[in-house]
Design a protein with these regions (language model features):
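Glycine-rich loop(s) and the adjacent beta-strand/alpha-helix scaffold that form part
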Residues: 2, 15-21, 31-110, 278, ...
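Short alpha-helical segments and helix-capping/turn motifs at coil-helix boundaries
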Residues: 11, 90, 162-167, 259-261, ...
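FAD cofactor-binding and catalytic pocket of flavoenzymes
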Residues: 48-50, 76-197, 202-204, 247, ...
Length: 310
């Protein structure tokens, strides 16, 4: 049933400008273009009575920071601040036993608290989800990239048959368990608009790290249980930059524009009919997968909207 919503796929919003009233009370003009073309493409424009940002932290915060400079000047100075992760570590444990099949069942079915601040969730991917092995290398810790590269090469030389079996198996996802390690420990990052993209800076706490000793120990123990090898993304092992699926904040809730970007109903301070309803609004580190938190917060925000016709 068509209820009035139209999804315009493969496009990206590049500009949002209030109409005649600078607070957006009479609506906005939204500019968008094809996001899959490397050549200059025609820009399109639509007018709307209101705006709901729901592009995830990287999409929403990037657009807000771009607009804050020229078109949405009333946005809070807190835009791009209070960004958090779950202090996350993603480690694959790949069994050397070709008869193993961990791909059947729900994606995440249990959670294990390893200490008062940490827990781990075993994750499974469906059969055929093998792309990640092209980006993986042995789990390696080290103080700098040269030490880590040396350890990687040593591991390949020491266990060549094991790694050849892992890289050339057609059943990588079936033989893999992904250990999703997360912590409640709090630290914040600030995003700023750079020359070509967003740049990040530490605001409070310790910088997120790809090298968490507790996660390494758990992965090594799991490897012994399933006769496997721990396996991480090459970006983590080589650059030391952590990977997270749960980035939060950047347009957080506050009492005023001095403490947040949106109010308790997700309305953007300084503008009418403008809301943020995604992970950008989350103001703390829940330490677990935030999907249901984001869903609940969005449902609450939508419940405050007047029903059509009232």
């Amino acid at each position: 049933t068509n209820i009035g919503a139209e999804i315009i796929k493969k496009n990206i919003v590049t500009k949002i400008i209030p109409n005649s009233n600078t607070d957006g009370s009479d609506g906005y003009t939204v500019t968008f273009k094809n996001s899959f073309s490397f050549l200059p493409t025609k820009k399109h424009h639509v007018k709307s009575r209101g705006i709901v940002f729901s592009g995830g932290v990287l999409g929403t915060v990037r657009l807000l920071l771009n607009m804050k400079e020229k078109h949405l000047l009333k946005l809070s100075n807190k835009t791009g601040e209070d960004i958090r992760t779950n202090n996350e570590s993603l480690i694959y444990v790949v069994s050397k036993d070709s008869s193993k099949d961990f791909s059947k069942g729900v994606a995440i079915g249990s959670i294990f608290p390893s200490d008062e601040n940490s827990h781990i969730e075993p994750v499974r991917y469906g059969a055929g989800s093998n792309f990640w092995k092209l980006m993986g290398v042995p789990l390696t810790f080290g103080s700098n990239i040269f030490v880590r590269i040396g350890k990687l090469l040593f591991d390949f030389v020491r266990h060549p048959i094991s790694w050849l079996r892992i890289y050339f198996t057609k059943k990588f996802s079936e033989r893999s368990i992904i250990l999703l390690f997360m912590q409640h420990l709090d630290s914040t990052v600030k995003f700023k608009k750079g020359l070509f993209n967003l740049t990040s800076h530490i605001s409070t706490g310790i910088a997120p790290s790809a090298f968490i000793p507790e996660a390494k120990e758990l992965a090594e123990n799991a490897s012994k249980i399933i006769n496997g090898k721990p396996f991480v993304l090459c970006t983590e092992a080589l650059t030391g930059i952590p990977t997270t699926a749960h980035i939060l904040g950047g347009a957080v809730i506050g009492k005023t524009a001095k403490t947040g970007v949106i109010d308790e109903n997700h309305k953007v301070f300084g503008y009418e009919n403008m809301y943020v309803c995604d992970g950008s609004a989350v103001s703390a580190n829940p330490g677990v997968n935030p999907s249901l938190t984001i869903t609940a917060m969005t449902e609450m925000a939508m419940s405050k909207f007047p029903h059509k016709g009232t």
